[in-house]
Amino acid sequence: TASDYYATSEYMNNLPIKDFGIIDENLRKRIVSSFVNNENKPYNKNLIEKTENFINIPFEELEEKSNKNLNLLRQKLASETIQNLRNHYDQNLFYLEAPTGAGKTNISIAFATELLKFDKSLSKIFYVFPFTTLVDQTFQSIKDSIDINDDELIQLHSKAGFPSNKTQEGEYGSNYKNYIDYLFVNYPITLLTHIRFFDILKGNSKEANYLL
């Protein structure tokens, strides 16, 4: 179905689609490098390069309540997560549970960059959330953490639909290429809600089935 849509689009609109939003080697290196070398978040570089140091900090030294110890606890949690990935990178399922404020969003971004380093077969990243507010928050966190362009990151939920109206001919004018990318999720990193995720897996609408 998808290939037929692409072929029809190219024939009717003279619009061949050649970029499917795949994470190639250049983008992979840019994501990893920008996360580690982000001047606004120097703790990411420490996390990746000094993982063992944070893991070896005894919990007894972090019992006193202070911002410093809170940040060290976050780094310790993140370091243990990264270390587990490095030891079991051939696994397909990981589970992270931590209280609010523990830095799970930053850990997830660090985890994704490490996965990209270990597994060259990974070509896309999907974040699935229960609430649209979490999509919005994580979208901004990703933009603040890595060097990613607007056409490489997308939000898919009911409050972030394709921002254009169809013309009388049923096309999107100069935005038609953007519409195709949105329809087929031609983006390296996609953030979506549970509703959209399960709609893709179990829905029977034409547009939902394009992604299967």
Each model region followed by its residue ranges:
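Conserved Walker A/P-loop ATP-binding site and its immediately adjacent core
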Residues: L122-I146, Q155-G161
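Post-Walker A helix-loop "phosphate-sensing" segment adjacent to the P-loop in P-loop NTPases
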Residues: E114-S123, D147-N149
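Inter-Walker segment of RecA-like/P-loop motor cores
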Residues: I148-K206
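Post-DEXD/H (motif II) to motif III coupling segment of the RecA-like Helicase ATP-binding lobe
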Residues: A208-L212
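Pre-Walker A (Motif I) flank of P-loop NTPase domains
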Residues: Y89-Y95, S123-K124, N186-P188
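N-terminal accessory nucleic-acid engagement/regulatory domains that precede
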Residues: T1-E61, S145
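Conserved pre-motif I regulatory segment
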Residues: F54-E97
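Walker A/P-loop
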Residues: Y89-T113
